[in-house]
């Protein structure tokens, strides 16, 4: 059973839950990430937050969403994933992967200043 949580518009019409699932500390195993994301879905959370600095989180999220699509018939399109680059982030990663995999990118103020001053 899905608990209907409130959703709000975010960006260009995406509807996201009021609560976001942060994945910084959920990188122990695929099984743990899968269960956390599955439980989040069933309480109405559809917004996942991650960052390259979270270790294996991005990979585990991707594998978990694929597994949820197969085992629970929960489409990957149900999710809004927010990625971010921290002040000491990898700008090459940002440059090479932003267009491929990211819908929403959060940049800390220090990152914006570095980008404005750099030629990437």
Residue ranges and their predicted role:
Residues 24, 51-53, 84-88, 115-119:
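Active-site beta-loop-alpha junctions enriched in small/polar residues
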Residues 72-95, 116:
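Structural motif corresponding to the early beta-alpha repeats
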């Amino acid at each position: 059973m899905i608990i209907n949580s409130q959703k709000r518009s975010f960006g260009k019409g995406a509807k996201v839950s009021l609560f976001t699932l942060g994945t910084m500390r959920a990188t122990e195993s695929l099984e743990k990430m899968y269960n956390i994301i599955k439980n989040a879905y069933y309480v109405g959370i559809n917004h996942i937050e991650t960052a390259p600095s979270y270790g294996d989180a991005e990979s585990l999220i991707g594998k978990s969403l694929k597994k949820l699509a197969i085992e629970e018939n929960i489409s990957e399109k149900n999710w809004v994933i927010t990625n971010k680059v921290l002040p000491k982030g990898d700008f090459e990663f940002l440059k090479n992967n932003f267009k491929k995999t990211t819908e929403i990118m959060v940049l800390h103020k220090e990152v914006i200043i570095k980008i404005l001053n750099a030629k990437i």
